[in-house]
Swiss-Prot record:
L-glutamine binds at S45, G219, G221, M247, Q250, N288, G290, Y291. The active site is at C246 (nucleophile), H330, D332. HAMAP family: CPSase_S_chain. Residues 171-357 form the Glutamine amidotransferase type-1 domain. Its EC number is 6.3.5.5. GO terms for biological process: 'de novo' pyrimidine nucleobase biosynthetic process; 'de novo' UMP biosynthetic process; glutamine metabolic process; L-arginine biosynthetic process. Disulfide bonds: none annotated. The lineage of its organism: Bacteria, Bacillati, Bacillota, Bacilli, Lactobacillales. This is Carbamoyl phosphate synthase small chain. It comes from Streptococcus agalactiae serotype V (strain ATCC BAA-611 / 2603 V/R).
Length: 358
């Protein structure tokens, strides 16, 4: 069956339908990863987005039980050049097509993803829709241009109830803004006792859990939409060590007076080179974000620790006076290189230092 991809600017791409037989709309973005499609599709940071994979062949090792970043993916669609109808991998349980059908996510293949990516790079991310052949392009485009993207993504993906992942090590409260399971795995490997709490949890509720440290997770959307989270961070910093990742990084920076802005097309993939400004060390990182921390009017209480090599985006900050730091990239690296997984050890060491001084 033929399927059409329509962009807000009027661009139309025709391809073959695969995945779920439904129509959809959302913000279209692109990811430059060669592999890791399962982790990307199940990453809640893609909530409400149609993912374009720039690598030409996707799905060649199928879907397996180990690489989920969430059980219920909330991306809106998948755009690829070619999907592997007959994947081969000893871990696979189903094909990409079967997985998308199971999760109700439509896909389109046979698209010139290079041309599509050039449009997004030039004009920025925009609204898009997937419709089946036979429907009115004019009507679909008119409805798309009138539509409004929702800004309550974190409300959709954050846990509604607190839950624990038992361990014998540090007591960590993990604030869920759209948590990736790989963050849980990294903390569990360090024997942490983890309590995952909703994004609406107050500072006092966190303090009542007597945590050794607080981790602010990744998540979708605009940090401007979370004033309560900013207040929570302001009230706990200095009392408990803090580590922020992705959305958690943006919220931590904003809570200390930094500004954030929407990027033209964002960073999505796991080949982004980041420089540690103090040591000069360059790491390749996994990233998925459409907003970033601005250097403009940068607050006195923070200093920049990392920057992206190509566009100088702020990739990490640290507090001058409190035991707290954050990074824009994903040190859990799922998918992606493990160059920066040491930051979880740095978080644990920061907790030890804070407790010794206290």
């Amino acid at each position: 069956m033929k399927r059409l991809l329509l962009l807000e600017d009027g661009s139309v791409f025709e391809g073959e339908a695969f995945g779920a037989d439904v129509e959809t709309s959302g913000e279209i973005v692109f990811s430059t990863g060669m592999t890791g499609y399962q982790e990307s599709i199940t990453d809640q940071s893609y909530n409400g987005q149609i993912i374009t994979f720039t690598y030409p062949l996707i799905g060649n090792y199928g879907i397996n039980r180990d690489d989920y970043e969430s059980i219920r993916p909330t991306c809106k669609g998948v755009v690829i050049y070619e999907w592997a109808e007959y994947p081969s991998n000893w871990r696979q349980q189903m094909t990409l097509d079967e997985f998308l059908k199971l999760k109700g996510i439509p896909g389109i293949s046979g698209i010139d993803t290079r041309a599509l990516t050039k449009i997004i790079r030039k004009h920025g991310t925009m609204k898009a829709c997937l419709i089946n052949e036979g429907n009115s392009i004019h009507e679909a485009l008119e409805n798309l241009q009138k539509s409004v993207l929702l800004n309550d993504q974190i409300e959709q993906v954050s846990t509604k109830l607190a839950y624990a992942s038992p361990g014998v090590g540090k007591n960590i409260v993990l604030v869920d803004f759209g948590l990736k399971h790989s963050i849980l795995r990294e903390l569990s490997q360090r024997q942490c006792h983890i309590t995952v709490v909703p994004h609406t949890t107050t500072a006092q509720e966190i303090l009542n859990l007597n945590p050794d440290g607080v981790l602010l997770s990744n998540g979708p959307g605009n940090p401007e939409q979370l004033p309560n989270a900013l207040q929570m961070i302001q009230e706990i910093q200095g009392k408990i060590p803090i580590f922020g990742i992705c959305m958690g990084h943006q919220l931590f920076a904003k809570a200390n007076g930094a500004k954030t802005y929407k990027m033209t097309f964002g960073h999505r993939g796991f080949n982004h080179a980041v420089r540690h400004l103090q040591t000069g060390q360059v790491d390749f990182t996994s990233q998925n974000h459409g907003y970033a921390v601005s250097r403009e009017d940068f607050p006195e209480a923070l200093f920049i620790t990392h920057e992206e090599i190509n566009d100088k985006t702020v990739e990490g900050v640290r507090h001058k006076y409190y035991p707290a730091f954050s990074v824009q990239f994903h040190p859990d690296a799922a998918p992606g290189p493990h160059d920066t997984s040491y930051l979880f050890d740095e978080f644990i060491n920061m907790i030890d230092d804070f407790q010794q001084k206290s």
